[in-house]
């Protein structure tokens, strides 16, 4: 989430924020990879559980974002790693479907974190569409649009009719991510975007954003935990989607609508910066608190 937000701040002229955030994201990614290599039994145990398994897709998503950063210095290597990340993510989707869908879906663990696995692969078409082979980029877009369309009605029904366990509470915020990824990817790749489809996807973005804002008091009513990270990426990618939608509407002659959407994006930047700042501060407190106890 912070890495995506740093890209937005770079667009506003704040390059240093992007550099610092991407370096930090690189360190975090290396730590996660180190954990998998050094403690494979722990990673394997987590992967057997539905919700943690769905979140493992975050590793390839961060990799894709970092490829868009490092391509300025090593374009060939960044492209290879990006394509590899897409392929690994695709394999992860297949394994996840086999483990958690084909044998029957358990409603207690059917939560919005599934979209991290299902639609997270679309990070590649948001940040690096030009680096992907055209057929791969198109396949990712078609998959993302189809799986979101299929899954979201069931997810809305599930959230409306069944209580989400406290441990999975913050995963509810992830509903903003898939529609935002679909919208941003579609506008990146479509030569002549459909006004109806863009309008429909942006309506989903607005509805999801409203859902999160309504839920914020619930999300922050509990003590800080790693699950708060579920708030970060959806909020950040929502800004990207809104900015792209604003540019599309303006370019299509809908200046008033484009202006309104641009102002909504401004509110999103304001709110997302506050949320991500609070979450990062919470993680720093956990880190230094653990260090003090160890000392």
Q: Where do the PLM segments sit?
A:
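Helix-coil boundary and interhelical linker segments in multi-pass alpha-helical membrane proteins
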Residues: 7-16, 68-80, 126-138, 186-197, ...
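Transmembrane alpha-helix boundary signature
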Residues: 35-43, 68-79, 97-101
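Structural signature of hydrophobic alpha-helical transmembrane segments
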Residues: 16-30, 75-90, 134-149, 195-207, ...
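Aromatic-anchored, glycine/proline-accented short structural segments
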Residues: 143-202
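N-terminal signal-anchor module of multipass membrane proteins
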Residues: 1-33, 289
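Alpha-helical transmembrane segments in multipass membrane proteins, preferentially the mid-helix core
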Residues: 92-96, 126-129, 150-159, 181-188, ...
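Juxtamembrane helix-loop boundaries in multi-pass membrane proteins
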Residues: 1-4, 40-65, 82, 100-126, ...
């Amino acid at each position: 989430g912070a890495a995506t937000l740093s890209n937005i701040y770079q667009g506003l002229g704040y390059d240093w924020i992007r550099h610092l955030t991407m370096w930090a994201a690189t360190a975090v990614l290396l730590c996660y990879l180190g954990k998998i290599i050094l403690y494979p039994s722990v990673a394997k145990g987590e992967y057997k559980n539905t919700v943690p398994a769905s979140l493992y897709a975050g590793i390839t998503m961060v990799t894709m974002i970092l490829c868009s950063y490092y391509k300025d210095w090593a374009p060939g290597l960044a492209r290879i790693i990006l394509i590899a990340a897409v392929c690994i993510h695709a394999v992860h989707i297949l394994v996840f479907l086999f483990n958690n869908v084909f044998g029957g879906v358990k409603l207690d663990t059917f939560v919005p974190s599934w979209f991290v696995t299902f639609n997270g692969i679309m990070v590649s078409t948001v940040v690096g569409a030009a680096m992907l082979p055209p057929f791969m980029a198109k396949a990712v877009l078609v998959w993302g649009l189809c799986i979101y369309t299929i899954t979201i009605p069931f997810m809305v029904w599930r959230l409306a009719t069944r209580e989400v366990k406290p441990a999975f509470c913050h995963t509810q915020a992830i509903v903003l991510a898939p529609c935002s990824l679909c919208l941003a990817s579609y506008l990146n790749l479509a030569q002549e975007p459909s006004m109806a489809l863009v309008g429909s996807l942006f309506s989903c973005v607005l509805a999801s954003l409203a859902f999160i804002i309504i839920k914020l008091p619930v999300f922050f009513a509990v003590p800080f935990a790693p699950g708060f990270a579920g708030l970060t990426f959806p909020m950040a990618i929502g800004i990207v989607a809104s900015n792209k939608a604003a540019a599309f509407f303006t370019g299509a002659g809908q200046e008033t609508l484009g202006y309104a959407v641009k102002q909504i994006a401004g509110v999103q930047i304001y709110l997302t910066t506050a949320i991500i700042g609070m979450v990062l501060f919470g993680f720093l407190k956990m880190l230094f608190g653990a260090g003090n106890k160890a000392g």
